[in-house]
Amino acid sequence: MVSLRSRKVIPASEMVSDGKTEKDASGDSPTSVLNEEENCEEKSVTVVEEEILLAKNGDSSLISEAMAQEEEQLLKLREDEEKANNAGSAVAPNLNETQFTKLDELLTQTQLYSEFLLEKMEDITINGIESESQKAEPEKTGRGRKRKAASQYNNTKAKRAVAAMISRSKEDGETINSDLTEEETVIKLQNELCPLLTGGQLKSYQLKGVKWLISLWQNGLNGILADQMGLGKTIQTIGFLSHLKGNGLDGPYLVIAPLSTLSNWFNEIARFTPSINAIIYHGDKNQRDELRRKHMPKTVGPKFPIVITSYEVAMNDAKRILRHYPWKYVVIDEGHRLKNHKCKLLRELKHLKMDNKLLLTGTPLQNNLSELWSLLNFILPDIFTSHDEFESWFDFSEKNKNEATKEEEEKRRAQVVSKLHGILRPFILRRMKCDVELSLPRKKEIIMYATMTDHQKKFQEHLVNNTLEAHLGENAIRGQGWKGKLNNLVIQLRKNCNHPDLLQGQIDGSYLYPPVEEIVGQCGKFRLLERLLVRLFANNHKVLIFSQWTKLLDIMDYYFSEKGFEVCRIDGSVKLDERRRQIKDFSDEKSSCSIFLLSTRAGGLGINLTAADTCILYDSDWNPQMDLQAMDRCHRIGQTKPVHVYRLSTAQSIETRVLKRAYSKLKLEHVVIGQGQFHQERAKSSTPLEEEDILALLKEDETAEDKLIQTDISDADLDRLLDRSDLTITAPGETQAAEAFPVKGPGWEVVLPSSGGMLSSLNS
């Protein structure tokens, strides 16, 4: 007889998908669940002694419980302040003909400067970096005076910056000995540019990134390093800072990053540049005062450390303390958080005295203008000063009736966006792994479909008709109910796609999981998962399985336990020391653990799991970038095997229909322009889709292609899809070994690789 595991029963009014209590029905959404996991990730940290903060080769966990609590308190204070400040909002004016002409002229002029800057910066990067002796010549403009001018970004000063760049581009750097191999050339250049970087060897494209950062610095410009995740943005930044330190520029330098990554920054600086001091500036007010007193004097000298701090501490101390330091360079890690134009960090950074800013982000830019404005404001703050004014440039709502056709309005928008892209071009560097990390094994992503079981179809029918509680009987727990917000209906439909036990266990209050045979038999995707794993384990593959729902991970944990499999697991409740232990165990070649269960948000960031060569996305995140970050846990530098990604989807369900629209940016995720207004669909103030719209999605007629693809995959096709020989090319010019296989068929479709984002071709 199959043993059963106890299941904790929580009143329905308190249930959410990650096991935490909720205060309203909307908290049952993946968004709220994942936000809580992110918060929990930052709170769940190990306790360490204060002096470890300065240990150059200490443990990777340097974040104490007190620091996490301080972070939480600062976050609450900031949220309260923002609520008070957001009492009212101004209405943006419409853009008339005169305004549009003026805007077009401004953008055209600024774009010309940007194109000129780009051309000359490329010359500098190719021909070499200005030598220190050239910088010291008295006839040239002094660094302090020139940098102050170049940072203003008005027309006159932009011309000065361009003129200075023309002068430098004519000065050839040292020629590299053509007899050297590519590796020897890279080593020689690294020793010249980054003499203090002694703890590792940069790759060729990373060294080019350092040279690009230096060219920005020499011209007083801000920049965005947007290399794809896993290409080493941290080490490129450290290499650049070591170049400045090695040339007598003592700083100070400030790194602002998420709390969970502070220890990684500290340890990477210690590893690659052991002669450079660094501190983690965090703790309560008294601890921060003590850190400043001991390590951050007003007079900056060679011993002044690189200061690493979190967003919350930076925002809290910007006006009162950090503004008194003349920061040479400020680095903002995970810079995509600045894409919200209302971000307080953007506002607080303006209080700091800083020569330049660098934003690091592995998330490509999306197709929305609000995000684009934030980046333009970050790069060119004196030109793009007002978000309301920027909004008005695209507000043609009053012109629809009289002055322009819809096509003309769209043409105007396209013209403006095209020019804005041109302005950003010189200031962003983005490389893809497929372009620069040629030694990285190839990756293939395949969507696999599973049809609903009769059990799931019956649940879906009851959900649509609001009769599920009655169907499950009198034992249903009352409280939250199922009638009400549409978002709640969408979530319940998605739960049914993932596994109907997510619904049944919540409603009937069952203490026990069903037998393993029922767990598999009740759900189409779980059947497909079992078929996949049998084949993968037979070929000794290690597998990462991602889901947004921690309760679904509970079901999987139970299933694997009953089957006798050893499992590792990370979600928002797992503390950092336990994470490190599990990652180490999973990465051990002798380990018997071949399965790693991870929640998409808590387990999709900041960890290296290249021991696995297979990633299964059991359910897809509303934000496709989260899934890309999850895939990159195993497809990154250090991977030696071809990687397969299997994205599971329930055929002809709300899951496939709504996600299809999310990916095409029509609903539920990205900022869109409609009716002349900006709407953030996931924002609390957004208007939810009407119930008839969601029900209409369920009733949509499938195309002939959909009917062909969205069905169960045969065993023969499954075996052919799991073959990876087409990803293995052992010699230059060798043809693919695997027989040609169609990109789609009954039960599957191969995802064609794409970099995504509106600026994906920026550095092509």
Curated annotation (Swiss-Prot):
The keyword ATP-binding applies. Keywords: ATP-binding, Coiled coil, DNA-binding, Helicase, Hydrolase, Nucleotide-binding, Nucleus, Repeat, Transcription, Transcription regulation. Residues 214-382 form the Helicase ATP-binding domain. Its EC number is 3.6.4.12. Disruption phenotype: Reactivated transcription of heavily methylated silent loci, via chromatin demethylation. Hypomethylated chromatin; gain of histone H3 'Lys-4' methylation (H3K4me) but depletion of histone H3 'Lys-9' methylation (H3K9me). Altered leaf shape, increased cauline leaf number, and delayed flowering onset (due to FWA derepression). Accumulates developmental abnormalities and transcription derepression by slowly inducing heritable lesions (hopymethylation) at unlinked loci. Derepressed paternally inherited MEA locus in male gametophytes and seeds. Reactivation of several silent retrotransposons. It is found in: Nucleus. Gene3D superfamilies: P-loop containing nucleotide triphosphate hydrolases, Tandem AAA-ATPase domain. ATP-dependent DNA helicase that plays a role in formation, organization, stability and heritability of heterochromatin and thus regulates several physiological traits. Binds to the nucleosome and promotes chromatin remodeling in an ATP-dependent manner; induces nucleosome repositioning on a short DNA fragment, and, possibly, could be guided to target sites (including silent transposable elements) by small interfering RNAs (siRNAs). Can bind both free and nucleosomal DNA. This is ATP-dependent DNA helicase DDM1. It comes from Arabidopsis thaliana.
